């Protein structure tokens, strides 16, 4: 089934994000705690810190997106998303929260249409409120997630846990490779591709 609109593409990207996070966090969940927190070569020095960064930034932008799409004022207390900088010490606890924010992003994207994609989304920054079109905010968020998941993937290569394949989401002939994980997430090929 083809992508039918930009809104549909954003929805599929949100589903891809949830699936990729699920697959990556499942692999990271096989690490010992020592490996999870071990210092490595990357932008953030540990798998733990990188995964926490993905999560806190997701909280920040998904909150801004939900508020902007509903017409609510921007959140003035955005520091709460980053204090503490690493809210979770274990992969298990982090995975639960990541799955919850991934579901929020899927739900927000499922409600998109062309008009909502054009909406200005106010984002609270330290310097004040900045506004981004929903399309640009989503593009940035998806890119941010991919960028840092790639760093975790590379760090996993230095452990005994094999880094998972993260590019088996969009091609129809690879549906069988993701079916079980989509079911675990409450998603299906039919729902994703006929939105």
Q: How should these model regions be labeled?
A:
Residues 113-120, 163-165:
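A short coil-to-beta-strand element that immediately follows conserved catalytic motifs
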Residues 81-100, 174-195:
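Charged/polar, low-hydrophobicity segments characteristic of intrinsically disordered regions
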Residues 3-7, 83-91, 127, 131-135:
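A short, mixed-charge helix-start or loop-turn motif at secondary-structure junctions
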Residues 11-26, 30-80, 124-188:
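Short, contiguous alpha-helical
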Residues 2-15, 192-193:
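Extreme N-terminal tail/first-helix region
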Residues 114-118, 158, 185-193:
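Long amphipathic alpha-helical segments
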Residues 71-117:
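Helix-adjacent hinge/juxtasegments
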């Amino acid at each position: 089934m083809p992508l039918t609109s930009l809104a549909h593409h954003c929805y599929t990207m949100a589903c891809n994000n949830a699936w990729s996070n699920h697959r990556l966090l499942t692999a990271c969940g096989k690490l010992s705690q020592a490996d999870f927190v071990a210092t490595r070569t990357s932008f953030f020095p540990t798998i733990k810190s990188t995964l926490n960064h993905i999560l806190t930034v997701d909280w920040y932008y998904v909150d801004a997106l939900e508020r902007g799409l509903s017409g609510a004022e921007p959140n003035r207390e955005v520091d709460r998303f980053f204090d503490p900088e690493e809210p979770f010490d274990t992969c298990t606890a982090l995975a639960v929260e990541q799955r919850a924010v991934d579901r929020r992003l899927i739900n927000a994207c499922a409600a998109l249409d062309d008009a909502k994609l054009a909406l200005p989304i106010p984002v609270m920054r330290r310097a004040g409120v900045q506004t981004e079109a929903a399309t640009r905010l989503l593009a940035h968020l998806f890119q941010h997630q991919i960028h840092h998941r790639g760093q975790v993937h590379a760090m996993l290569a230095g452990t005994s846990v094999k880094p998972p394949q993260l590019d088996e989401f969009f091609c129809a002939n690879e549906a069988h490779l993701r079916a079980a994980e989509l079911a675990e997430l409450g998603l299906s090929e039919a729902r994703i591709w006929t939105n």
